[in-house]
């Protein structure tokens, strides 16, 4: 009897606990699916994905050269030592194993190709991933990217040969093509207000910068004291948590009506758009100094200023703070003066060019920090000003689907980071470090005037379609007419009769509309 009552009480208690947990889960789910809160959670998920991708990109900097030196540039050989008898005759011999350096192993080429393989595969994959994102939305590609990055990180943790590490690095490039493009496109899609979009993309850029700058000391410390696998396992665990959080917020594989989704513009059409091409060129140009300096500046510091290991290890760390400052300033300026995004980008290119030309003149670590900080400040200006401009260009010229246009942005970054590890060392060897920096600086300064081409586009207000600004024609089709009428009505003060225009009136009004 007592046992039966105890079982009954236990069942009742379990039922209450289960009911309470279910109710709490519903509340949490409801709170997470509240539109504004869900948008913020998705921003956090995307920022974590950006952080992980850039940490995985840079965490190998202090690890791989030392690890490859161990597994590839030394080979195990056996040396035979003869033992002579008392009368000088050879009685026996002994063998001992020693590590002998392999003179034929080209470490620089191996490391350069390994570093560049991620950007190369990312560059090749982006045209396809951009189209895929436009077709299926942003959540599924983001989940695919996080999954690929998880397996790439696990492979890095336990890989012991150059071939396995190369495969893991290339696999990360494929994951980045999905995660980076879909993540940035998701932010542009969720934050439609220009000032909010610029701020959200600025936050994502801050996480990208933080991941790139904090990863080398993070990886170096854990590698030295805990082993090669520890930093990669930590990153894979965070990647897993980010994927789980994404599944809690969205249901990527739930049934949905694809026929109601907007059809994005093909990526090849976006690539030949002159405005988008100018922005893409600026994104590539501004990242060339960073991509080419990362593999070469340490050796130059060692030869020129006899820099210590810790100085070379934290070379880029102080630059994180001016990068954040650049993001903050650009976001504030864009909110107050949104029509001058092109100007902020042009100023950033000039700062990058001047900083790059100044670097070879530095003779100690303290002097070097100043141009490096200015360099990252300029990059922040360019990225924060021009990434939202890509979404704006798609909004006013095409359909507001952002997968392909941010695939183009990712291609722009990948071009710089694919060429840097492979070409930078050879350029320094053939021409010199000074000539490399002067060339990069000159390219950035000369490209800045090209952003004047965006001046007229940036003057357009987000509520206007480019069809009646640049092409001087009215909206085509009933959908365009209704949208334009609604947008104009929203801009008119209360009491205006603009909301009662007929289709004919709207068409007539817009054919002669200029602002």
Swiss-Prot record:
Disulfide bonds: none annotated. It is a multi-pass membrane protein. Glycans are attached at residues 84, 87, 92, 306. The chain crosses the membrane at residues 41-61, 113-133, 140-160, 170-190, 202-222, 230-250, 272-292, 311-331, 342-362, 368-388, 405-425, 433-453. The keyword Transmembrane applies. GO terms for biological process: chemical synaptic transmission. Signal peptide: none annotated. GO terms for cellular component: AP-1 adaptor complex; AP-2 adaptor complex; terminal bouton. It is found in: Membrane. Residues 62-112, 161-169, 223-229, 293-310, 363-367, 426-432 are lumenal, vesicle. Residues 489-515 are annotated as: Disordered. Residues 1-40, 134-139, 191-201, 251-271, 332-341, 389-404, 454-515 are cytoplasmic. The keyword DNA-binding does not apply. Keywords: Glycoprotein, Membrane, Neurotransmitter transport, Transmembrane, Transmembrane helix, Transport. One of its GO terms (molecular function) is acetylcholine transmembrane transporter activity. Electric lobe. Its main location: membrane. PROSITE patterns: MFS (PS50850). Involved in acetylcholine transport into synaptic vesicles. Two classes of cysteines are involved in transport of acetylcholine. Binding of acetylcholine to VAChT involves one class of cysteine located at the cytoplasmic N-terminus and binding of vesamicol involves both. Organomercurial-mediated modification of two cysteine residues inhibits binding of vesamicol. Belongs to the major facilitator superfamily. Vesicular transporter family. This is Vesicular acetylcholine transporter. It comes from Tetronarce californica.
């Amino acid at each position: 009897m007592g046992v039966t009552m105890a079982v009954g009480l236990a069942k009742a208690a379990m039922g209450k606990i289960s009911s309470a947990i279910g109710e709490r889960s519903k509340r949490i789910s409801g709170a997470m699916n509240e539109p504004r809160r869900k948008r913020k959670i998705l921003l956090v998920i995307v920022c974590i994905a950006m952080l992980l991708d850039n940490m995985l990109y840079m965490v190998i900097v202090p690890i791989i050269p030392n690890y490859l030196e161990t597994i590839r540039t030394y080979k195990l050989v056996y040396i035979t030592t003869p033992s002579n008898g008392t009368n000088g005759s050879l009685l026996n011999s002994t063998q001992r194993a020693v590590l002998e350096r392999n003179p034929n192993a080209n470490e620089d080429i191996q490391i350069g190709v390994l570093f560049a393989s991620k950007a190369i595969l990312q560059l090749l994959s982006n045209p396809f991933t951009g189209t895929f994102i436009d077709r299926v939305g942003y959540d599924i590609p983001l989940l695919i990217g996080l999954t690929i990055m998880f397996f790439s990180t696990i492979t890095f943790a336990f890989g012991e040969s150059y071939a396995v590490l190369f495969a893991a690095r290339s696999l990360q490039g494929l994951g980045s093509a999905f995660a980076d493009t879909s993540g940035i496109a998701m932010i542009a899609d969720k934050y439609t207000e220009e000032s909010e979009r610029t701020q959200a993309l600025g936050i994502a850029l801050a996480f990208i910068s933080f991941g790139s700058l904090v990863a080398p000391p993070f990886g170096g410390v854990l590698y030295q004291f805990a082993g090669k696998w520890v930093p990669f396992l930590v990153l894979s665990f965070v990647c897993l948590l980010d994927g789980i959080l994404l599944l809690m917020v969205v249901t990527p594989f739930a049934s949905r009506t694809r026929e109601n989704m907007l059809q994005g513009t093909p990526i090849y059409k976006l690539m030949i758009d002159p405005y988008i091409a100018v922005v893409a060129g600026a994104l590539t140009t501004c990242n060339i100094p960073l991509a080419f300096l990362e593999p070469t500046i340490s050796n130059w510091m060692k030869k020129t200023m006899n820099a210590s290991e810790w100085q070379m290890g934290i070379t880029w760390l102080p630059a994180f703070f001016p990068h954040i400052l650049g993001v903050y300033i650009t976001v504030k300026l864009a909110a107050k003066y949104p029509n001058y995004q092109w100007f902020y980008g042009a100023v950033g290119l000039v700062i990058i060019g001047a900083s790059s030309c100044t670097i070879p003149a530095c003779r100690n670590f303290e002097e070097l920090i100043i141009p490096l900080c200015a360099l990252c400040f300029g990059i922040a200006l360019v990225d924060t000003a021009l990434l939202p401009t890509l979404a704006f260009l798609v909004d006013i010229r095409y359909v507001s689907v952002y997968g392909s246009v941010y695939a183009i942005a990712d291609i722009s970054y990948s071009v710089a980071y694919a060429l840097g590890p492979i070409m930078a060392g050879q350029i320094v060897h053939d021409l010199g470090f000074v000539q490399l920096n002067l060339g990069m600086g000159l390219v950035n300064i000369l490209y800045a005037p090209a952003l004047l081409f965006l001046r007229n586009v940036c003057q357009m207000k987000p509520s206007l379609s480019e069809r009646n600004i640049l092409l001087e024609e009215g909206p085509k089709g009933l959908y365009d007419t209704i949208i334009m009428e609604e947008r104009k009505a929203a801009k008119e003060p209360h009491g205006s009769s603009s909301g009662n225009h007929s289709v004919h009136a709207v068409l007539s009004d817009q054919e002669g509309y200029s602002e």
